Swiss-Prot record:
GO terms for molecular function: inositol-1,3,4-trisphosphate 4-phosphatase activity; inositol-3,4-bisphosphate 4-phosphatase activity; phosphatidylinositol-3,4-bisphosphate 4-phosphatase activity. PROSITE patterns: C2 (PS50004). Catalyzes the hydrolysis of the 4-position phosphate of phosphatidylinositol 3,4-bisphosphate, inositol 1,3,4-trisphosphate and inositol 3,4-bisphosphate. Plays a role in the late stages of macropinocytosis by dephosphorylating phosphatidylinositol 3,4-bisphosphate in membrane ruffles. The lipid phosphatase activity is critical for tumor suppressor function. Antagonizes the PI3K-AKT/PKB signaling pathway by dephosphorylating phosphoinositides and thereby modulating cell cycle progression and cell survival. The gene is INPP4B. Pathway: Signal transduction; phosphatidylinositol signaling pathway. It comes from Macaca fascicularis. The keyword Lipid metabolism applies. InterPro entries: C2_dom, C2_domain_sf, INPP4. Residues 1-24, 370-405, 435-460 are annotated as: Disordered. CDD domains: C2A_Copine. This is Type II inositol 3,4-bisphosphate 4-phosphatase. Residues 1-13, 394-404 have a biased composition (Basic and acidic residues). Residues 23-165 form the C2 domain. Strongly inhibited by inositol hexakisphosphate.
Amino acid sequence: MEIKEEGASEEGQHFLPAAQASDPGDCQFTSIQKTPNEPQLEFILACKDLVAPVRDRKLNTLVQISVIHPVEQSLTRYSSTEIVEGTRDPLFLTGVTFPSEYPIYEETKIKLTVYDVKDKSHDTVRTSVLPEHKDPPPEVGRSFLGYASFKVGELLKSKEQLLALSLRTSDGGKVVGTIEVSVVKMGEIEDGEADHITTDVRGQKCALVCECTAPESVSSKGEKTLEFVPVNLHLQRMQVHSPHLKDALYDVITVGAPAAHFQGFKNGGLRKLLHRFETERRNTGYQFIYYSPENTAKAKEVLSNINQLQPLVATHADLLLNSASQHSPDSLKNSLKMLSEKTELFVHAFKDQLVRSALLALYTARPGGVLKKPPSPKSSTEESSPQEQPPLMRRQDSIPHHSDYDEEEWDRVWANVGKSLNCIIAMVDKLIERDGGSEGSGSNNDGEKEPSLADSIPSHPREDWYEQLYPLILTLKDCMGEVVNRAKQSLTFVLLQELAYSLPQCLMLTLRRDIVFSQALAGLVCGFIIKLQTSLYDPGFLQQLHTVGLIVQYEGLLSTYSDEIGMLEDMAVGISDLKKVAFKIIEAKSNDVLPVVTGRREHYVVEVKLPARMFESLPLQIKEGQLLHVYPVLFNVGINEQQTLAERFGDVSLQESINQENFELLQEYYKIFMEKMPPDYISHFQEQNDLKALLENLHQNIQSKKRKNVEIMWLAATICRKLNGIRFTCCKSAKDRTSMSVTLEQCSILRDEHQLHKDFFIRALDCMRREGCRIENVLKNIKCRKYAFNMLQLMAFPKYYRPPEGTYGKADT
């Protein structure tokens, strides 16, 4: 940005009010020289170390920007930032821009007033003129924190065009924080200045990405604004080089337990809350009709099928009419075949007993609709039988009322769709048979099924095909519309029952589940992409990926005591919900390779983008868009002093049930793996791995109910690695206990797979814990190189989970 001294020049005068510009005695002002159509000045704001007026209050900060013109000496409110909630160090995304036509000079003074907003409904941007140095009157719903002011020239001439100003109270005495003003730099590139532009931009972009996408730190896990973000998510990679053995790569992802830390665990976690919610719904049936989660899911499935199949049937019916108008027998037969297939699927979708029972429940729930006994079928309808010829269904109330309701009415309405289709088939057969004898032989089979329908259709000339099929198609559509109308109302009634009991409680549970799932999903996507890239040229892995799917194993170190019970309950549900996730690999069409998540709560698809060169190396099934499934399992063993209390005086049944349930899931995955993978691959796989024995050993350890049986985790991790799975290790913060477990796992791999001598095992273990990425992870989170353990705690830890002397002490956790 160039600063230019001007007197009475044209460029300077257009910034002055007209009355002042005509005064020859007017003083000179320095205008800001900018390219036309560019803003004269842009800057961004950030506050640091703000002092709250009330102790322990979380600030909701807003900055009001006002301008003091050098000529008029009046204070004009110009704009304001957005509100940044819950922090003493807000960074505002809304900058301040002065357009090219705005009268601003180096001598122009800008005043920044910081407020704590208590009621957002009163926060509006206003423009008004006040005498200089007069503070605006206090706004309703906000309290004054402090102010600072500067001249535009001071900002532009400062080092790096950055000012750090002290915020002071209205009397100018007490300092209540700092506000930073930074110019947004948009300069021009001259010859010779662009040599390193690519390197600089990439470096800045990487720095921004690292800063903005960094995982939530341990100290922030209780903040509401970060509750959907995984805690301390990191990739731990060990690459082993050996002169005698093949090089190997081992990845473990470490992350804090996916849980609703902000909401807390006073009433337990999701597993307990969901069970209690279902029990209360079941036992409060007088307020609503109870439907199990399975029935609710079935209702959603049927509604989804309806929405997909109805337009398909209508489309194929129109295609049939189009073929009839063209008098094309082959096209007519093909269109009829497609119509028949889609209509049969449509009819099959309503065979479930849930639709019938929902119709009855909806009728009974209506005022005055208490069903005492089913009405006689004879009095239920006076319409002609659809067996003679499907009539055009007359529009009526989709669910008949008290006096004329018939439980068998649904069967008749539903069956009319099939009968209408049979009439269409019979008519098409008759038309084709009359058009050519040989072409009709294949359709006589259908005619034998419904001889009365075929024989009852009179002969018609060839040119009347469209006119003869049109009424039958219209009847089919009307019958379908009647079925869809009734089914949608009844199944929607089923879904509404889910919310009939304690709607706020249901919404809070849904929110909690979404929070936990979001954290788990972020880690899963990270793990999947890393595993895909490291195994991209492994044909066995790629075949397993699209044939069977991937096992995703979570190792939990949470205790079954106090708040960590709730964390474990949240974590168990969140990881189980990952079964709803499928992956789809697509070719990247641009440099944007960030994954994209689509779908709803019942089913998510994550699209992973690969560059063209990498995408071409994939098997055909994956390139064609086949969905790739994951099988998440969780094994948890508490290892700290709280687990000692739980084992001696509390309850460990939660941990036992989780381990048993997930062992069964792991066993089921192994069974599918052995059935679906090719025999030659299986024979080679079995020579290298004895998974059956490992699974039996794992089952025995789960059944043994041994205290702090960490062998469960060792066996589960080994099985996961041998099945080409993705590994996660979790504790409350993924910082202390997780560090002990991951380093132990790495040393065990070196010993078992890469011939690390047993005499060096402990030395290598201590070295990994004293130096390297684990202690750096601790430093990054709490600014201290100390694991948050004390001597008494470590006495309760299993032997190999204790850090070396000098690496632990009093620290944040």
